Amino acid sequence: PDLVFFALTDDAKLNRYNAKAPGTVEASLTLSGLSIGEKLLSIDFRPATYQLYALSSNSRLYTINLTDGSLRVVGTGFTPVLNAQVANIDFNPTVDRIRLVTNTGQNLRLHPETGAAVATDGNIN
């Protein structure tokens, strides 16, 4: 199928692929706006606005400009802070909130407009 998807690289790039040729990078954007040592861990599109969001290792959310690769921080960061090396975000379109889970069991809900944690749920086992 003619389906576009995106992936992060370890060197702060966002690659675009097509499912017709998943091994071929169609385009690559160098991402700008991270602090020194900060990494992006996960991305997901917000269904309500079609914006691409990213989670950083510094417990912050960003939106990604798909034209120039610039990052815009959302809020000032969230608490409790990440206590993991592996994390994933996923939008719940029904309530327009971000689910954040980590390899250490953290399970948070984040607000896409403020970047704040709005709920801490039970640990994921």
Task: Describe the function of each predicted region.
Residues 1, 45-49, 91-95:
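Residue-level detector of Asp-centered blade-edge/turn motifs that repeat once per structural unit
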Residues 4-8, 50-54, 97-100:
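Conserved beta-propeller blade signature
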Residues 11-15, 58-61, 104-107:
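Loop/turn residues immediately N-terminal
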Residues 15-59:
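N-terminal carbohydrate-binding/catalytic regions of secreted carbohydrate-active enzymes
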Residues 19-22, 65-69, 111-115:
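Short loop/turn segments that connect beta-strands within beta-propeller blades
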Residues 37-44, 77-93, 125:
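Repeated scaffold domains used in trafficking and secretory/extracellular systems
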